[in-house]
Structure formats: C-alpha cells, structure tokens
C-alpha cells in the first residue's frame, strides 16, 4: 500500500480500513498517519523492512497481507476539507497456505490518560497469530517521568502474572534511559 496526498494536518483525519474476505468489521482501522508511525500529523522519516516514510510525505507499507478471495481497502476523509489521494497497491494472485494469518492493525487513544492508570495497548485478541509490534505516540502533560510504564503481555489465560513483564516503556522501544532531546532536555 503506497498512499500519498498533501496535508499533514489530515493524517489523523484520513481513516484507513482493510477488510478480508466478506468481513463486515475491518481488520485494519487506523488513521493514515498513525498507521505509518507519524502520530499527531508529525512527519517522521522511517526506513524499515515493513514501513517506509520518505521525504515529501510518501508512505510505503510492505507488510505481507495475504487474503484468499477478497480484499477491500477504503480511505475515509472525516475532515470537512477536500483532498486528493494518490495510491498504488501491488498484489499477487497465488495459493495461500491454510495456516496463513490475516494482517490486523488498530488505533487506540486515551487523551488524557489519568495519572497512574493502566493503558491497554491491545486487548481481548482471540485466535492464533503473531504480534509484530506497536507504534506509540505519547506526550507528557506534567514534569513527571513518563517511562516506567512496564509493558506487560498477558498471554493465553494469564491473569495474576504476565508471561512477559518489561522494565519500562522506554526499554520496550529500545531507548533505555529515555529519548531525551540533548538540546532541550525534554
């Protein structure tokens, strides 16, 4: 999926939805900017295997998204402003293994998150599959430390103790001891 259009201010207003087979509820439902790791309409150059965000606002998604019979992709502009969207979708018609999983992505937002409350990234997932990661855009509204969020994974019936328990939000994103801006110390 390679969309492109003018207007960073619309990245949160353009909603990407992807439906597999005859689904009535989308497996992917996310603002376009957030799907491409550009939260709050802020440009972030990304060069990774599954996602690239290039100068000039070109978004490229290379996640494998197999389907068997039907795929429907929609883009909904929820703003009052008209825009033009350019896109390219590449696909191959081939046999899909029976155990092949469908791609899913969701958007979750709490604004503001009450101090000291648990923020759930992904909840109540059923079935087999692979969790491939999280993109998170956050802001701090106080002078307190934001990092010790302790990312926890409760898997396959865990209740009292998680299968995986991290040491802090910044560590989950490979930024041990913060992502402090060396110039502003923010």
Question: Model-found features: residue ranges?
Answer:
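Beta-strand-centric surfaces of beta-sandwich/beta-rich domains
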Residues: 2-186
């Amino acid at each position: 999926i390679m969309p492109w259009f003018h207007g960073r201010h619309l990245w949160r207003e353009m909603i990407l939805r992807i439906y597999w087979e005859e689904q009535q509820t989308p497996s992917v439902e996310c603002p376009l900017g957030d799907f491409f790791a550009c939260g709050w309409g802020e440009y972030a150059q990304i060069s990774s295997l599954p996602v690239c965000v290039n100068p000039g606002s070109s978004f490229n998604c290379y996640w494998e998204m197999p389907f068997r019979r039907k795929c429907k992709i929609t883009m909904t502009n929820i703003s009052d402003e008209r825009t033009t969207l350019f896109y390219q979708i590449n696909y191959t018609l081939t046999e899909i293994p029976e155990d092949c999983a469908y791609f899913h992505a969701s958007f979750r937002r709490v604004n503001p998150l009450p101090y000291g409350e648990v923020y759930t990234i992904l909840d109540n997932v059923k079935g087999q599959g692979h969790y491939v990661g999280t993109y998170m855009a956050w802001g701090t509204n106080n002078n307190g430390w934001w990092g010790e969020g302790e990312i926890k994974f409760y898997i396959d019936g865990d209740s009292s103790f998680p299968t995986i328990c991290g040491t802090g939000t910044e560590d989950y994103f490979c930024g041990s001891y913060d992502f402090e801006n060396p110039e502003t110390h923010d």
